[in-house]
Structure formats: structure tokens, C-alpha cells
Amino acid sequence: MTVDGVVAYPQHWEADVVLRDGGTAHVRPIVPSDAAALQQFHVRQSERSTYFRFFAPLERLPESDLRRFTQVDHRDRVALVAIAGEADAERIIAVARYDRVDTRSAEVAFNVADDHHGRGLGSVLLEHLAVAARERGLARFTAEVLPQNAQMIAVFREAGYAVSQRLDDGILTVSFDLDPTERSREVMADREHRAEARSMRGLLDPASVLVVVAGEDDSDRERRLASAVVRHLVGSGSPGRRPVVHVVDPAVPDDDIADATGDLHRYATVEEVPSAVDLLVLAVPAATSADVVRRCARLRPRGVVVLSGGFAEVGPHGLALQRDLLRSAHAAGMRVVGPASFGFVRQGTGEDGSFRTVNASLAQDLPEPGRLALLCQSAPLAVGLLESARRRRIGVSTFLSSGNRADVSGNDAMQFWTDDPATDVVGLYLESIGNPRKFSRVARRLAATKPVVVLTAGRSGHVLPAGHAVRLTRVPRQALEELLRQSGVIRVDSQHQLLDVAQLLVHQPLPAGRRVAVVADSEPLAALAAEAAASAGLTVSGRWTVPGDDPAAVEAQLTALATDHDAHDAVVVVHVPTVGATDPAVPRAVARAAAASGTATVACILGLRGITPELTAQDADGVPRTVPAYAAPEDAVLALAAAVRYSAWRSADRGRPLRLEGVDTAGARRLVAERMRDAGPGVLTLEQPEAAALLRCYGIELWPTVVVRDADEAVAAADRLGWPVALKSTAGHLRHRIDLGGVRLDLTDPASLVAATDQMRTHLRGFGEADRPFEVQRMSAPGAACVIRSGEDPRFGPVVSFGLAGDAVDLLGDMSHGIAPLTDVDVREMIRAVRAGPRLFGYRGLPPVDVAALEDVLARVSVLADDLPEVHQLELHPVVVGERGAAVLGAQVQLAGTDRVDSGRRVLPT
């Protein structure tokens, strides 16, 4: 946006970032007041670094250079600085800049503080600078580098772009296009994954913890929270395998803390703590939390868990306190869990290879150690989830409550669990999803190797708890369903189902297919389980009734079924004796048969639920295997069906990134940047020639139309376009409505066109639209009329939608949705997902249409939407798909300024 030709300060370029070592920094555009800090940065640099940057020794920057470096226009001359510390203690630790050379390219330069080398600052700044340059219509970066500057050369080479190099007179010129490549996307995702996983590892595996307790005059609730977490920290694990605990308590320690077992180091103030700590836990009033974080910064904690409430969940004042807390923490290199967090539990192998237990939570009774990782957000839900897992004896490796989710979220936790050797299955209870686009990307990566079970608060996922920072969304709730389906997670409807599915995935192998054998001790129970299996989309390969009072017969039948892998993929066992209790030999027989066969098995046995010793046996390798027990046959079958769907997704072809010919992304960005250059706030609708030019950049040809006022102009237009033609009203609610008289088709000669013009004007008089002009367009071949849309949603990012035009879309909302970027498989599935889809494949004698051509148009819209966040709304309507080819007959494109939540650069919440 410009004001009187001057580009406004790009606030949306500011961001907190996670670095390679898990620490944080702040990135923002440079401003004139940075001159002194930039000079200090320069003076601190070594002679070698200065020579690499300026190709000459330069002890101080001349005043003219300082002005030129800090006074930029944020369009043709852009500079970003990475900042450590806050307020008076701010330090510039890296600088990146570009200067436009011509309409397409700019020269870039980077300089990283000597004492911050190796933290990935150059890579992060390159990502952010590239996004800014693309926003300004640039397509290529060049840089002049000394050949011996290996670190800077590596930044360019390792970014994943197609880099060209030229050595001339001792200077290496490096250049590359800015359009993201498949490789550059992979590199960014890998770097993001490693940085965020490392930041979480530093937080979840502390060797030392500092708990700061509220003062005597503060809320008693905060003191009770502190008492609980200290007691749990010092009481978890054995000496040498639990963290060292420091407590800052300005009041007299209460009895709970004084009586806690284990060694404690007590101090009256933060300033008395003598040495660095890994983790900070706050139980202080919201109003003082940011100050406490600033005072603790010298101790260099990697993260802070905020147990206290009183932040964003209580309103605008609390939100301001939360943002102040976040700024202070990130400035000191800390990640934030909370506020209003229940804390976290870690039961697993630490970085040093030893098993450790850290209970930095409010939970007194923990589930036993195991292979399930759990995340929820608010504290009340944490209580129920942990207690349910404990009662079922489902072992937990990590439990994390993100509270208000001001910083650390489910995305960060999934990054950590992807490589966590202690975790096999992940369960998420999400009251909100702050960055759905990133969630989809991270979850898909995790789900490729570990099952992810997801429960959202409200089936729509649009329920927003107090304190959760979530952007508004315009998309229908089906978009969230599609996002979860794309990402490969297992969607469940209740906490009960989450643990039902998790206990199966932790303890049983994935089913190889949908064929299920049912074994029960009565025919009615067998029928009940079989009906539940069929309703859940499973194939009942057979059902058997075996007397429950004959454990040997049960084991023999199960062994025979489970070893017949050509006929059965899973087994459901139901045993409910009508007289007396369950014979202990029956579950032992079930366990032995399941362990020996390796076939996925679930059981509903009276008196057993969860993970029980009665249903545990050793497999051929001596590894204990447990058959999960369920309260009802339907529960067992639903859990099994979820595992079957996940197994099918994991083994299916999930597609490849779209690679399309004839795409001019740089040209499209220049067109959009030029059109947006002098645009104010609000939505800008492109004229048809502009829309056609933008679509042409992506290989989409918009059929031309001519606006006419009368019959003579209509005939002249038809002569230019070619006969036969269609005549359309330009009224928005009539332009696609043949049934309302807004469209006349197959007009083959001047006489029919003149008659249609007169008749339509008379007819439209009843709608009050008689004075509107008409559109004339050449007729396409007969085919199915479709609608393709894209929209830049504030929360979901680029959402692409598809449907068959008419009442299926207008009245029934029959559209499929996908979150860009799509794969080729995503595109195929979107077209086949709509209920009216059979019309495309030869319905009731109609010839099948050219679905491949339709897929190509949808794929091109997906790439456009992913590339151009400024495209606020796009609609292709109709897209007529015939037996050969697809014709785009109408298009509307709207542009608007935007700040995409997941824009191809690493950012943290702020």
C-alpha cells in the first residue's frame, strides 16, 4: 500500500522466528533510528566478516552509508534486521537487504554477527527477504560474493533454489529465481522442522527448572499452583533422573513446598539464583509475568511454562499482558507454553540417552510411561484426558497443555514428536487451530510415519475458546474436514474415541486391509459386531460362534483365523458370559493367539477395558503384546475402522507436487504488484482484460466476451468472435440463469441474435434489468458446466473449491475443498468427491467428459492461489467440459492486501 506514492512501513514483515539451535530472534524492516545500532553491529564484526561483506577493510560505516542503509523505501530498496533483546537492550545480530536492479531482479547482501554464526540466521533472512521481494514483483536475486566466503555461498546453495554461478575477476556472482521450487519448499520445511523440534526438545528435557512463586500479597491461587508443580517436580523420577529444582519464593514457603521430598534450592529473589537454568515455570499474577521473564533472561532458560491465568482469556487488557509476555520471552530466546497451561509431563529418553521423568504439571497421578504422546489446550480438558489415560493404563511418553496457545502449539509438538524415539502414536485434543495450513503440512509429515488422532472442539472446528488467537474464517466447515483428510490424521468425535483409537494403534499392528473376522460366544453378539463393522465401512470376511466356556476352542479358532492372512486382515473378539464372571483363561487365550499371529485384534470382554495384563502375551520375539479391550463391540469396531482408514491412507499414493507447463509466475506477480501499487485498502475487482491476462500467466485461456448495448452491436460482435454465439445478461443474479431468461444459447445467425436480444430485453424488464447491457460470447462445445473457485482465507490461506454449476452448488452446497498447495492426487480426488460427480463420467447414457482437461484447469487455479495471496477471490464460472477439452467462459478476480498466515517464511506467533 502506498500513500502519496510512498510505501508505508510493512508491519506484516515483522516476525519472531525460531533459529537452528532452538532459540528465537525478531525480524523486522530496518528504520532510520537503527543507525546507531547498525554502526555498533558493524564495529563488533571481525575484519574478516567486514571484508567478506564490503570487499575492503572498513572500521566504521561513513555517515552517508548509514543513511543509505537505514533509509529505505520498502519497495525498491529493502532491508531486514534480526534483533536479539528488547527495548534498551536491543542488538542487531544480522542484516539482509536487496536493491532493485531492474523490473525483475535485485542484488542482495547479508551480514551475520560473528558471535551468532551457525544459528541459521542467513537462511531465515533469505526466506523473509524472498517473500518480501516476491510481494514487490521481483523474480530473481543476484549476489556478489568472495569465493572464500564459504558460509554465504552455502546459504544460497542449500536454500533449494536453482543457483547459477559465474566467477569474474575474483568475484563470484550468484543468481537464482525466487519462485519456490519443490526442493526449496522441502528445504524450508526441513529447516523449520529441525528448528522447532530442537526448541521443543530444550523445553521438554530440562536438567534444571526454576519455579517463580507469587508473592505473599498476591493471589493465593498462584501460590497453590506453584506448590503443586514443585511437589510434582521433586517427586518425579529417581535422584539423578529428575531435574534440579530451584524455587524463588518471596514469601515464607508454605507447608506443601516445605514438605516436598527431594533437594530444593530456595531463593527470595530471581537475582539470587546463581546459575543458568533450562526451564522457567511461572505462577505469578499476569501483570508481573513479563517483568519476571525479563529479570530471568540472564539465566538463559530455553522455555517458560506459564500456569497463571488472567491473560487473553479475560479480555483486551489481558491480551495486552499476554503480548508483552511473549515479546519479552522471545527477546530472551525463550519459547512460551501457555498462559493458563496445565503444564507438561515428559517420560522418556532425554538428549543424554537416559530415561527421565519430568512432571512440570498440576497432575498428581500420572499414566505410566508408554508410547502415546498427548496434547490438549485448556487445563480442565487436561485433567480429564490424563485421568482417562491413567484409568485405561495407556502409557504416555509426553503430555503437553498449551493453554492459550500464545506461542507453543500443536504444530510445535508434532514437529518434536516426528523424531521422538519415545513416541509411536500422537493424540491431539484441539479447541482451536491457529494456523490450519501449517497444521496440514506438519501433520501430513508426521502421519506418514506415526498415527495422529485428532479431536476438535465442536465438529465444525469453529468453536473459539476465550484467549485463543484465531483469525476469522469465511470457509465452510467442510474445508476443515478436507484439511484433516488431506493431512492423513484420524478424526474422532469424543475424548472417549480418541483413547479408544490410540490404545489400538499403540498396541496392535496396522490392519493390512478392510476384511474383518468376528468371533463371539453367541450368535446375537456376532451379528451385532458384524453389523457395526459393515456400517463402519469394513468387510466382514466371516463370523464364528465359539462357546465362551471353552478357552482352548477360542484359542484354536482365533489362531486359525489370524494366520489365514489371505482371508482376514483383523479380528474382533466379543465375549460376554451370560452366567458368572469371565473365565480368566479366555482373555489369556485371546492374547496368546493375537501375539502369535501378528494380526490386528480388538476385544470386548466383560469386566475388561483398556490395556490389561489379562490380555497381554509375548510374541515370538519375546515382546509383550496387548489386545486392547473395549466396553462395547461398537467401540471396538469403530476404533478398528479408524485404524483401517489410516492404514489405507498411509499405503496409498499421496501424490506429487503439481508441475505445470506454461506458467509465468513472475509475470503474474508483476501484474498483481503493479495493479496493487496504488490501490488503497479494500477489494479491487479486475476488469475482464486484466483477469484474462492474469489467468493467461497460468495457462488458463479465458474465452473473450464483448459487452453490447443493442442488437446491431451484438451482431457485429458475433461476426468478430465467430458463430454460433451465446447472449447473456450482465446482471449478476441472471448471467448464468437460463431458467430465468438471463442466457440464450446457440444463436447461429444475425436474425436469431436480433430476435433473442429483443426478447431478452422485454423479458428482463420484469426484473428491472431491461436497461443493462448484454454480453456476447462464442459458443463452446456441449459439455458439463462446472465452477472452480479460490479464496484467500485469513485462517486457512488459499482454499480451492470445485463443483458442478447449478442447483448442486447454489442450493445444496455440493462443493469439494482443498487447501493449496495441492498434489495431483488431491486434484483428482476433489473432482470425484462432489456428489454430482457421476455426471462427468458418463451418467445415464451421456458421454463422459474430458476429466483430464478439467483436472488441468483445477490444478492451475491451485498453483495460482498458492503463488498469489493477493488474489482475494477467484471464480471461473462456467467451465464447460466437453468430450475434448475444457472452456473457461467466465471469470471474476478480486485482489486485496493480505498477510498470509503461512507465507513461506518461518514465523512464530506474536
Predicted regions and their residues:
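Long, contiguous binding/interaction regions
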Residues: 1-202, 206
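Catalytic-core regions of core metabolic enzymes
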Residues: 183-910
